[in-house]
């Protein structure tokens, strides 16, 4: 199973532009990998080699994204797939997953309803590594 990357040739998402979705991804990556600056995150960046992320970081990023789009995903009973976790290498892989999830959500929603990321939900989340600390 590989990533489709349909968004590279045809952007079908109506609720968010490429730049808006990429900004959401960058915000999530820099929240989990807090030593990074937003301008360091590119589509081609390798999460493990360039940013020293591990599998817990990747899972955390997907959980943050799921939380940011929770209202729409719960309404449509759409979930972020976990079957591709082991294949996520690049930042664009995360974007690809979310693009496909958001397309699925849009296909199940009223066409006049826009999906909006909830940045407040992200702010309320603790960093994954802090969940089990005593701080």
Residue ranges and their predicted role:
Residues 2-53, 57-63, 67, 71-135:
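Phosphopantetheine-dependent thiolation modules in NRPS/PKS and related acyl-activating systems
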């Amino acid at each position: 199973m590989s990533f489709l990357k349909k968004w590279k040739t045809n952007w079908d998402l109506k609720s968010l532009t490429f730049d808006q979705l990429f900004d959401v991804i960058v915000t999530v990556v820099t929240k989990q990998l807090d030593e990074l600056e937003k301008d360091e995150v590119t589509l081609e960046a390798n999460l493990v080699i360039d940013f020293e992320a591990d599998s817990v970081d990747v899972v955390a990023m997907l959980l943050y994204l799921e939380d940011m789009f929770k209202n729409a995903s719960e309404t449509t009973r759409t979930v972020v797939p976990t079957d591709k976790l082991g294949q996520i290498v690049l930042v664009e892989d995360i974007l690809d997953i979310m693009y496909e999830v958001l397309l699925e959500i849009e296909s199940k929603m009223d066409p006049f309803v826009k999906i909006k990321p909830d940045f407040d939900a992200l702010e309320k989340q603790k960093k994954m590594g802090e969940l089990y600390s005593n701080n």
